[in-house]
């Protein structure tokens, strides 16, 4: 376990408080950081955790992370809807030559992509609620908006424009969750578990995709509107889980301290760590957060203009957030998740729904691996290895599709062997994506920004994710209809750019508190040297203790040590 070497600080109440060196004095901590109260920062160790300690942390964070289930559920059911006969009859067009209903490329693209437009707008609109109403209440509000969108879609009958309006409102709620849930997770999570806990958001997104695939598989043989209305109706169950969960989880201690609610902030830190609010480590954490809030206040009120500040390196971090979220879509993952059923029918499989379930299963279990290892490997290594692995898989996938899938031309039968090989490399690709970029992109955005501009910066970064998801979702039917599997090479080029950007511009933040990450950026450390950077508060400590404590997985698995 590490101990801080910072001198003890005397912290006065209010934004203009003085912070000065004082000798260690043990005093009872009162509400609001009063004069002459001192926290002895030396030799204060984080609480030891046993089985119950870990379970409490993960159980408290899980309802927050369940917000990721909402966009995942939409991806899973939409991939099935566009191939359902009753859905096409209600919202498609009739082709007299074949006597069948179909979805045009434009309508199919809009059906998939309008959700993303709603998400982009929702993230921008609702992110500010986190600063005015608190993280928890803001999440409840966006979930209610999501439910309104679901009602509009379910009540649609032969009116595709009504369905699309519902889809946009549906997206407003999911987009708000995509900003607010990772934000709250990053602010209540212990430093050594932050990566894994934020990754739970992505894990639940993959869980939503998987269950979405299963739901449309189960209703695909219905011959009425229950074929698509039942999967839509199930979303009310998922939203209730989130709303009830918000009554149980702690509020962000950073938000509470910004509102001068210091006692509640200490209670929040204590609850997530299962210790007393008077525990010295809790007091030290509250002290550090308060110092960071005071430092931000000295810079003035937050504004949109501050996002472009070069002096505080916020602009650099905003560009990183935008590009990481953009690259997340340019991996090509939604090419498979949105159109997976369609793609695998094109390679000769009679039931593309079953293959989608296989892909959803690979996606879900691969993300579980990411949750377990992301705080051991680090952000940079995950992103670099992931980009390289996806690049190799996409090259092989596209090459087989171009050269081997149709040996007698596009109008001839497809090769079953080539089709099976494409499915195998799709699974490898999804493994590489789900264990690296899928969770880490959200971690990077959630932990990069100072609290003062966090809601604004995260909303812009996440909006770029949804904007690119819209573009890929809308234009993919046109592009694949024109260049077929050559489309994969476009994503290969993007993956090369991603690898280079991460290597040269993205710093390593594993083991650092949110306040220490701000110092990392401010000191201008080269990204490829950032893994060895030590925060000022830990300089001078022996090297083996210079990093924030990391979980001993053997102890965690055996539960042989730790107290609750």
Swiss-Prot record:
GO terms for cellular component: cell periphery; fungal-type vacuole; plasma membrane. The keyword Membrane applies. Residues 74-109, 158-167, 216-229, 351-356, 403-424, 484 are extracellular. One of its GO terms (biological process) is hexose transmembrane transport. The chain crosses the membrane at residues 53-73, 110-130, 137-157, 168-188, 195-215, 230-250, 334-350, 357-374, 382-402, 425-445, 463-483, 485-505. Keywords: Membrane, Repeat, Sugar transport, Transmembrane, Transmembrane helix, Transport. Its main location: membrane. NCBIfam families: SP. Probable glucose transporter. This is Hexose transporter HXT17. It comes from Saccharomyces cerevisiae (strain ATCC 204508 / S288c).
